[in-house]
Each structure stands twice: as C-alpha cells, then as structure tokens.
C-alpha cells in the first residue's frame, strides 16, 4: 500500500473536486444556505485542476490494483480490521475517526462494519470486513458468517 498520507491527500482532493462539481448549480443559487464546512470543501474543490484530479484518480486506481495484488498473492478473500481506532464516540457530536475506513473507501473496495462487543464504558466496538473490488455479494456472504461468529463470542 502506498504512503497513507498520500492516500489521505488524494482522497480529500477527489472529495473536494467532486463536491464542487455535484453542487455547482445549487451552490451558485443557494450557497448562503450551506454549512460552513461544506462551503470550504466546495471552494477547495473549485481550485482543483483537471490534471490534479486525473492524477488523484489514477493514484486511486493504482492503490486498488496494489490491494488486489496483495489479496491474490496471499490467497485472501477479505481483509478484517478494526472499524475505528477505538470505541464509538459518546453522543452525536462526532461520527468518530475515519482513519481505518479511508483506504478502503478511497480504493472503492466494499466494506461491511460488524458489531464486535462493547468497551469498558459500554460503548460499541466494531470490525470491518473488506472485500474485493466489485465482489460486494461475496463480502456480504462472508459478513453474514462473521456476524454469527462474533455474536457467539468467537
């Protein structure tokens, strides 16, 4: 896998550029109604050149190829990793840290998050299963089996 910092930067660039494209008309007409963080994202996205976006999209495809090659070379059907670096946050102010999901989301690989118990404070913990690109149905089959195993404490 390439440098994680590069993956994060690429992901943010693509996210901003696509947000600017998708919201172009509505933002022009109703920009004053947008949340400040969305305004910042759209304005950043407007600054992304076609060349920068193309390079980021190519990097995303390269990451997907690298992950697929790793799976092929090691006979992996899926990856299993934590959903987040810790338990879910208390309250609704935050959805938590996306660090554990970002590489998979960026590469376009399907993910399923599974309940994996509670921490000492009673907050939920999770695992995510990551499947091969365009093999969502196989991931769902694996995830159903994993869910049963996790529920049994295994």
Q: Each PLM stretch: what is its role?
A:
Residues 66-73, 99, 145-153:
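Generic non-transmembrane alpha-helical segments
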Residues 66-69, 92-115:
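Small-aliphatic-rich amphipathic alpha-helix that forms the alpha element of a beta-alpha
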Residues 11, 55, 73-74, 83-102:
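Short, surface-exposed loop/helix-turn segments at secondary-structure junctions
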Residues 77:
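Conserved acidic residues
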Residues 48, 54, 106-154:
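Structural helix-boundary/capping segments
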């Amino acid at each position: 896998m390439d440098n994680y910092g590069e993956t994060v930067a690429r992901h943010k660039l693509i996210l901003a550029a696509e947000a600017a494209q998708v919201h172009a008309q509505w933002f022009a007409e109703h920009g004053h109604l947008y949340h400040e963080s969305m305004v910042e994202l759209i304005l950043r996205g407007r600054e992304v050149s076609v060349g920068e976006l193309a390079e980021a999209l190519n990097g995303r495809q390269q990451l997907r190829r690298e992950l697929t090659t790793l799976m092929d070379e090691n006979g992996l059907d899926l990856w299993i990793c934590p959903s987040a670096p810790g338990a879910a946050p208390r309250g609704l102010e935050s959805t938590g840290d996306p660090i554990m999901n970002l590489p998979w989301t960026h590469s376009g690989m399907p993910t399923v998050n599974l309940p994996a118990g509670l921490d000492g404070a009673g907050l939920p913990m999770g695992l995510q299963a990551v499947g091969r690109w365009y093999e969502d149905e196989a991931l769902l089959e694996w995830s159903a089996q994993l869910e049963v195993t996790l529920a049994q404490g295994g």
